[in-house]
């Protein structure tokens, strides 16, 4: 079995690592957006033996781990975790912020000097880590291996894929509004064939043909508020989060981008991660590779709803099962 180092980076209050002896072949860094440390205890009974419980059982759990800054938006959060410093030094102070040198508000990863690789809105691909002022752990890995170790970042959010991967990444991939993965010319001249093939298979269709139904009896979600209550908003600003949710109808009406606000946004990202490991030959030589994955569907659901609602817990619970499956797949590799 190849040496795989699987680390879970909880944005932004905790860090857990599944440790192995010796130099790892592959490091997999995972951020779960809006996954607070307290959820490990709060939802512990929901965990299977191959997911979080395995990480807790075989790894380390650091409970007193803080970055002294605010606000904890996606971009400064991911940047702080991967650079090990605060926005004052790495420069990413928000998702959007006013840049005095340019006298305008900018987006954290926008870059007019690059172009999209892949389908969709060209502006969605004008992205790079050029505004990040500090090196990341992934950058330091590239430097320590004389650029021989591969680094790939991925997420359904552009900033969550680009910033963790750092300046020297081989690739970063993120999802466009049509449910397909894209990149930019910062990383290469054309999208890798395996990513084109992945997009052409339209995995999102098989996921969106399912009704989103709770995996457990609603009565078992006793630590959360009930379904259909006045405190919840709408998923993607238009979908009532009352279960079961007919995702296929929403897909037909509004396109595949709806997958971002479901647990299957995380599923399709895990599928892409396994495709990257296979097609990029990650972990196949003596140089440590790094795969930075940021699961963001929990963030979309958390913003639309609330942490105390059972809809959010359902999303977390579904993701826990996906983590277990992903962990098993990694171990087999």
List the predicted regions and their residue ranges:
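Bacterial Sec-dependent N-terminal signal peptides
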Residues: 1-23
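Loop/turn elements at helix/coil->beta-strand transitions in domains of secreted/extracellular proteins
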Residues: 23-28, 58-62, 89, 146-151, ...
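Second-shell loop/turn segments in exported
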Residues: 36-42, 65-67, 122-129, 256-263, ...
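Short, structured active-site-proximal loop/turn typified by the sulfatase FGly-forming signature C/S-X-P-X-R
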Residues: 40-89, 150-154
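His/Asp/Glu-rich, glycine-adjacent segments
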Residues: 86, 94-286, 296-303
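Terminal, contiguous helix-loop blocks that mediate binding/assembly
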Residues: 301, 308, 324-325
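Metal-dependent active-site segment of extracytoplasmic phospho-/sulfohydrolases and closely related
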Residues: 318-333
């Amino acid at each position: 079995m190849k040496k795989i180092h699987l680390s879970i980076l909880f944005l932004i209050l905790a860090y857990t690592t599944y440790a192995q002896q010796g130099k790892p072949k592959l490091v997999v860094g995972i951020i779960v957006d809006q996954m607070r440390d307290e959820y490990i205890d709060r939802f512990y009974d929901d965990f299977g033996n191959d997911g979080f419980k395995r990480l807790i059982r075989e790894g380390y759990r650091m409970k007193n781990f803080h970055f002294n800054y605010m606000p904890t938006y996606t971009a400064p959060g991911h940047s702080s975790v991967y650079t090990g410093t605060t926005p004052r030094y790495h420069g990413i102070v928000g998702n959007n912020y006013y840049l005095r040198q340019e006298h305008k508000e900018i987006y954290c990863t926008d870059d007019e000097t690059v172009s999209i690789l892949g389908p969709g809105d060209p502006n969605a691909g004008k992205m790079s880590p050029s505004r990040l002022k500090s090196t990341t752990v992934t950058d330091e890995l590239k430097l320590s291996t004389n650029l021989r170790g591969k680094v790939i970042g991925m997420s359904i959010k552009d900033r969550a894929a680009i910033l963790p991967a750092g300046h020297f990444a081989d690739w970063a991939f993120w999802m466009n509004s049509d449910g397909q993965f894209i990149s930019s010319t910062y990383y290469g001249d054309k999208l890798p064939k395996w990513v084109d093939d992945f997009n052409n298979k339209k995995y999102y269709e098989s996921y969106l043909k399912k009704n989103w139904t709770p995996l457990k009896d609603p009565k078992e979600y006793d630590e959360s508020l009930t379904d259909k209550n006045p405190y919840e908003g709408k998923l993607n600003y238009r979908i009532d989060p009352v279960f079961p949710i007919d995702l296929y109808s929403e897909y037909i009406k509004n396109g595949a981008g709806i997958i971002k606000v479901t647990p299957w946004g995380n599923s399709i990202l895990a599928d892409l991660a396994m495709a990257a490991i296979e097609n990029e030959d990650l972990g196949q030589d003596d140089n440590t590779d790094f795969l930075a994955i940021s699961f963001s569907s929990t963030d979309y659901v958390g913003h639309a709803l609330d942490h105390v609602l059972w809809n959010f817990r359902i999303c977390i619970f579904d993701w826990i099962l996906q983590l277990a499956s992903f962990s098993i797949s990694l171990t087999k590799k």
